[in-house]
């Protein structure tokens, strides 16, 4: 029995549970929700959510994430594919970088009007000045160091300035960033192969995706819309924003 105070304190959770139940009844699919940065600790929570999923049913994932650890994203999509018939990733807002890797392993990507994927740009997570975790783009770390080296060569007197500007970056972080960047294409290919594509299909898709997802983008925030995604050959489609399913997804995300 729930006391009035307990009910009030946990009302948000009970409402989300009701929304998830209603969505599952309409679609006939299991639904899990991930609204978070992707880090290794996500795996334990995900396994808890997938624990009793029927592998003969479809699985829908509501995903909103700025990115994170690509290796964890690959582990997550592999685990989900083992627990379902077909995997649909629903993107109401953004699924960047590592979250895009996760989407590449799905059978379907359902995107809202403002939904977008992003470049596969590894994020380096390190302690900030306040002790909290902060993230920086691996590509931007390497680029910043490269530009600093060029400017110092041209003007050795600028060394103290750049040493101060890059005081939070050490050599280990730079090497980790370079290693993460070199792994990006392999992660993309592994994610594409998760849902059962043939080697030929993976090769063809990877060739189309390498330029827009890895090589070309200069910013982690670059937007890849549903039209771009379908143009690259991904199984993306626009959500029906007037449907009852989308109303439930929007309430869960908000």
Task: Describe each model-derived feature in a short phrase.
Residues 1-254:
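Terminal-region recognition feature
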